[in-house]
């Protein structure tokens, strides 16, 4: 007869449960040929994602230092100080600003790739926990970040569904951390685009000097957003790990 718990596999000859359901709780590997969704540990991916987000925050700190130096030295130039020391600092500020911009772009790309892989993993796990608890198709885990307009709310909606499905106690936890992360993400995205446009139009020392406070604001918001994103990743990863070890992983048909 079929297992009385999962209703997918034959029960063991001497019981009413299959070998999968009688296995120790936690993340299990599917039997060969089983076309099912199975829990897979998000711990390694979660830690890697959090580390990259921490690196992004560190790069933002470096960028803030470069911004302040640029603001300071352009203020001297605007004030008429063109001594050798000021010119040397101006060259250093140019170099540090360029390095910071390149580092931010590289880390952003790395974070995006690893984050989406982690997001896909926790979404699949959440479907195992709660097959009917998701309002958006799984493909939106990726498409939601790149399709115009829907990117303003789809990733948050998916995250909330995953968050609720992953609550170890079986009751949805509060969404304050997710909402704070998403607000900061929208803010840093908008500020980044505005500041990039503004910086691209700044040609004179006065214009560069005037753009630096906005640049520092954008880098500061990005720093906080990265830290909140890491907090969400670590919290959700821990929630899924705890939930997986509360009971056996039950397979669900695709």
Report the location of each language-model feature:
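Individual transmembrane alpha-helices with interfacial aromatic-anchor signatures
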Residues: 174-175, 209-222
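Membrane-interface extramembranous regions at the lipid-water interface
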Residues: 2-94, 114-142, 152-191, 195-208, ...
